[in-house]
Design a protein with these regions (language model features):
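Nucleotide-sugar donor-binding catalytic core of glycosyltransferases
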Residues: 4-273
Length: 273
């Protein structure tokens, strides 16, 4: 279920390794970035740019920067405090970029603004992290040999951390003998999602592993292993918007469970139903 997505992701984002005697420098600042500079280092954006540039990363508006990545959630003033630099919008929320505030934008919306806009939904970053996680000798999903993700030494603990997921993907267990449906959410302010959960749960119990509609008595720590123990996963977005597709549907595919999805009306453009 997930392997074709992984292959398509690797093939759609080839980064030819260019040999530099000295890679050109790139000063990047981050503003209003969840988790700050350390989280930015884990992102797909940093991974891509680091193949071409020697990056200096900071969060200080008084230091020079070639570009600043951020989003206006919280305070646009932080973005404006960076002077003489190109501002790049990036968001994980259902939010339209303000091109009066930003020079460039990366987001969910299906729009064409020439070289000022790139559609790269949040699920793309999730695919990046999934690709990193399966660079492991025990993972049921395999990376192509020429992938940049194979440049690092592989780990050896995926199966230990995901025994049920590996068994299902490797046809070592019966997928029809799994539980009915799973649900993991942390945001209670999603009335359509909550209403659907109640309706489905009234027909057959849906196991909740997050802080919303929890049925376990604790929040699951390993989401993918949890999802893999059920036939279906209720993976509704918080809100609806054309192009707004987050990591939720990727988590379902990765866990070899069938997604019950609501969110972007155009989701079939991203994933073949």
């Amino acid at each position: 279920m997930f392997q074709p997505l992984l292959d398509a992701f690797i093939e759609s984002a080839p980064i030819k390794k260019t040999i530099f005697k000295s890679p050109p420098p790139l000063k990047i600042a981050v503003a209003n970035w969840w988790g700050g500079a350390e989280e930015f280092k884990k992102s797909a954006l940093y991974f891509i740019l680091s193949q071409r540039y020697k990056i200096t990363l900071h969060q200080n508006p008084d230091k020079p920067a070639d570009i600043v990545f951020g989003n206006p959630l919280g305070s646009a003033r932080k973005i404006l405090s960076y002077k003489n630099t190109k501002r790049v919008f990036y968001t994980g929320e259902n939010e339209v970029p303000n091109f009066n505030l930003f020079d460039y934008a990366i987001g969910f919306d299906e729009l064409d603004f020439r070289d000022r806009y790139l559609r790269m939904p949040l699920y793309y970053d999730r695919l990046h992290h999934k690709a990193e996680s399966v660079n492991d000798t025990t993972a049921p999903y395999k990376l192509k040999d020429n992938s940049l993700y194979t440049l690092k030494k592989p780990t050896h603990h995926f199966k230990e951390n995901h025994p049920n997921l590996c068994a299902v993907v490797n046809n070592e267990s019966d997928p029809l003998k799994r539980g009915f449906a799973s649900f993991v959410a942390s945001n209670p302010n999603a009335p359509i999602r909550n209403a659907f959960y109640e309706a489905l749960n009234s027909i057959e119990p849906v196991t909740g592993g997050g802080s919303v509609r929890n049925t376990l008595g604790y929040n699951v720590k390993n989401k993918n292993e949890f999802l893999s123990q059920y036939k279906f996963n209720l993976c509704f977005e918080n809100t609806q918007g054309y192009g707004y597709v987050t990591e939720k549907i990727i988590d379902a595919y990765f866990s070899h469970t069938i997604p019950i999805y609501w969110g972007s009306p155009s989701v079939a453009k991203d994933f073949n139903p």
